Amino acid sequence: MKSENYIRLNEFIKSHDNIKKAVIFIDKNFPKPVVFIFYSMLAFLALKKDKRVFVCAAIPWIDFYLVTKLRNKINRKRPFESIGFEPVLMHTKGKSCPSRHASSSVIITFAVYFISPFFGIITGIISFFVCFSRVLTGVHYISDVIAGMAISVFIGTATFFGILQKK
């Protein structure tokens, strides 16, 4: 998306109060059910003494760690910094790519789906809104979100539906 499109999108959202409130609500609140479902699944596995609890906790943690290291190294400016507009939602500067919200929500979706396809689909739908909201708030470029998602799709596919599926 071109710079002027980010500015227009940002101005449109900020000039429509209900849309702005909805975008902020999604950005602030939709990660919560993803985390709740994930932790509930881990607790369920732990209570059942299911050894899958370890990989279902470790793989998202490893993904989070790798994405954090990569974004620290890249240290890409956020759209509001490089283009020069006030975002819908204020955020710290730098470390925009890859999006950790996008990456985390996608890898959690893989972990949840690995245990329960039903809850995995629900988590996936919620994660879509989490990812989309990061662009709408002006804190990520589309490419930041796609990069975060791609990393987690690769790691999730390779582990949950590759290595672990063969065991």
Question: Which residues does each PLM region occupy?
Answer:
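N-terminal transmembrane-helix/juxtamembrane module of multi-pass inner/ER membrane proteins
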Residues: 1-36, 67-94
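Membrane-helix interface segments
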Residues: 17-19, 33, 49-52, 116-122, ...
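Interfacial segments of alpha-helical transmembrane regions
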Residues: 40-66, 119
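Transmembrane helix-loop junctions in multipass membrane proteins, especially transporters and channels
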Residues: 47-48, 72-80, 138-143, 164-165
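Small-polar-interrupted transmembrane alpha-helices in polytopic inner-membrane proteins
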Residues: 58-71, 121-133
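Transmembrane alpha-helical segments of multi-pass membrane transport proteins and ion-pumping complexes
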Residues: 64-68, 72, 153-160
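Membrane-embedded catalytic cores of phosphoryl/pyrophosphoryl-handling enzymes
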Residues: 84-167
